[in-house]
């Protein structure tokens, strides 16, 4: 278990991809703190971690609020130690066509999906630098590369996430801190299960592997990037999209 003794912070961990990532890092031996936007969500994370034999806890966090971020990072350090693995997974969508998009639909997505990387990464870097070890893993999207109608806000945030990671990787590499991104395609989640059957079928025709991805398949890639086996990987974006977009 290569992550034994390391503290990992996973934002947006109450379900789906975030939950799968939290459990995978825990399986590798990390102490995992997963965050949710509500106290009830944080409690569910704590229960899920405990049920799966993972040390750690759920915490309530608003990634768009400076004070909330500072409080959670302080609590983690006091209770568990400095987080040396950060997975920026929390994100929202506010879909609309550009002509109809309201200001708050744009700014809310940018603040939650992109500005949060600045807040959280800056908050953990001092501890990582002191330890001369760190893993920052940002969860992007295939939409950041190929675009998607009705999601100019989301696409901009996810494309920005990749540029952010490459620049930061250059800044902190000399301290043995790696910064990478994982860009999922369409994953089998509650959201995609609610799509009309015709829309799901049309979606599958765009995916050479002919199926939606599983959250656990994203988690396995994140687990690799967090491990010692990925010590020489930095500034990379790893697509996990079934061939929907090839670069």
Where are these regions (language model features)?
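Active-site helix of classical SDR
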Residues: 121, 157, 165
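Substrate-binding pocket helix/loop in short-chain dehydrogenase/reductase
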Residues: 97-98, 102-110, 192, 203
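Alpha-helical segment proximal to the catalytic Tyr-Lys
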Residues: 126, 170-174, 231
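Conserved glycine-rich Rossmann-like NAD(P)H-binding loop of the short-chain dehydrogenase/reductase
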Residues: 28-44
